Structures are given as C-alpha cells and as structure tokens.
C-alpha cells in the first residue's frame, strides 16, 4: 500500500497548497488580504518523546505556511498562522502522529525476540527519522504546486504569500518576545531510523481527513494515544 499512501498524501497536500495559492492569486494586486489576521492555537504534546513530537508539529506547520513554538514546561505547542492553514495543521499533525504510533506498536508486536523495538533509542530514532522524511515529502509536493501555479498565474500570487508569511512571523514574535532554539536530542538506532523512514513513506493523508479541518472548530485537538 506504500504507493497508494504516497498518492493519497500527495493529493491531499496539493489540495491544501493549491487552496492557499488560489487565495493568494485572488488577492494579488489589491489590499483586501491585508485585512486578514493570523490566529494562534495551542496543541498539547504528550510525553514521552515530546521533543520529537513537537518537531513533527513544527515540520507540518512550516509545510502549511504556519509557525510552531514549543513550551517544554507546559508540554504545549502554539501554532500561529491563518485560520484555514492552522486548521489543516491540526488535522495533519494528529493523523501523522497516530500513524507513527500505530507503526511503532506494530513493529513491537511483530519483532523477533530480543529486538529492541521498545527501547527509548529505537523509538526516538524512529520518530525523528519519520519527521525528517515527512518534511521531505511535504516540501516536494509544495514545490511542485508552486512551480505549476507560477506557470498558471505568472507568479502574481508570490508577493501575497510572502506578505502572509511575514505577518505570521510578526504575530509569532509579538506573542513570544523571547525564544530560543535547541537541537532535538535522541539516541541513534539504525533499525529505528530505517523503520521511521519506511513508516513515513507509507503514511497517508486522504481528502476525508481534510474535511475535518474546519477553521471554526480549530483549537480542540483530538486525543492521541500516548506511547509507552
């Protein structure tokens, strides 16, 4: 099902990006887009592996024209962006995290005796590899849509997208006047890294998932089963 999963994810991500591009093209050359303002929501990041999970959220947010800031003291991440984009981030992150956790559970269930699929280093490496590969896939899809839209619209939408990106960045910095960055640390496990990449290639987001991305209900994250 790997090829089918890739096709579903590509189609869904293309739909999301095309929607943003079409909206930007609609506002190209006028000032109506400047009346729209970014919003912010908080999404709980449950232990364990909060660093890896928050990095997955950050990766999804960036691919969806949003920004994410993690507060390790509260185990919360704040996502900043325009309402439609933020709603999609919530749904996309939840679905991808559930699929990662399902893959980890299956790996532990079917592993031969003595395999370290339940070790912290294996699971941390799995989630980091999964996030890295998901980021690559989303970036590839986005670039394809932007390239095609540039042919269709002649690039008129690009200044609007840049303006929106700047406003999201300004809104985030106004909310968080002091921010620091740090590397996500996790034990390296070759098997965990390979399994994470495979799970990311198999991960699917279909159009039915996106129907849940209602900006009027954004901010009520769906529960996600914790890893143990």
Task: Please report, for each region that a protein language model flagged, where it lies by residue.
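Short amphipathic alpha-helical coiled-coil/interface segments
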Residues: 5-19, 127-134
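Extended, helix-rich structural scaffolds rather than catalytic motifs
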Residues: 21-228
């Amino acid at each position: 099902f790997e090829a089918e999963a890739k096709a579903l994810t590509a189609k869904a991500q293309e739909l999301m990006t095309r929607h943003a591009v079409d909206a930007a093209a609609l506002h190209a050359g006028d000032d109506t887009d400047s009346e729209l303002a970014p919003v912010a929501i908080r999404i709980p990041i449950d232990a364990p592996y909060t660093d890896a999970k928050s990095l997955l959220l950050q990766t999804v947010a960036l691919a969806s024209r949003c920004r994410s800031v993690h507060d390790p003291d509260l185990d919360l991440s704040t996502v900043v962006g325009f309402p439609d984009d933020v709603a999609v981030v919530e749904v996309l992150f939840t679905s991808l995290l559930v699929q990662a956790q399902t893959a980890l559970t299956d790996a532990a269930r079917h592993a031969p005796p003595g395999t370290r699929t339940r070790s912290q280093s294996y699971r941390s490496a799995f989630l980091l590899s999964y996030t890295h590969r998901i980021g690559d896939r989303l970036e590839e899809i986005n670039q394809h849509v932007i390239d095609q839209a540039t042919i269709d619209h002649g690039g008129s939408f690009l200044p609007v997208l840049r303006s929106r990106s700047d406003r999201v960045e300004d809104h985030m910095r106004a909310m968080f006047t002091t921010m620091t960055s740090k590397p996500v640390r996790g034990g390296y496990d070759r098997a965990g890294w390979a399994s994470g990449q495979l799970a990311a290639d198999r991960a699917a987001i279909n159009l039915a998932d996106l129907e849940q991305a209602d900006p009027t209900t954004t901010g009520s994250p769906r529960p996600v089963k914790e890893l143990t």
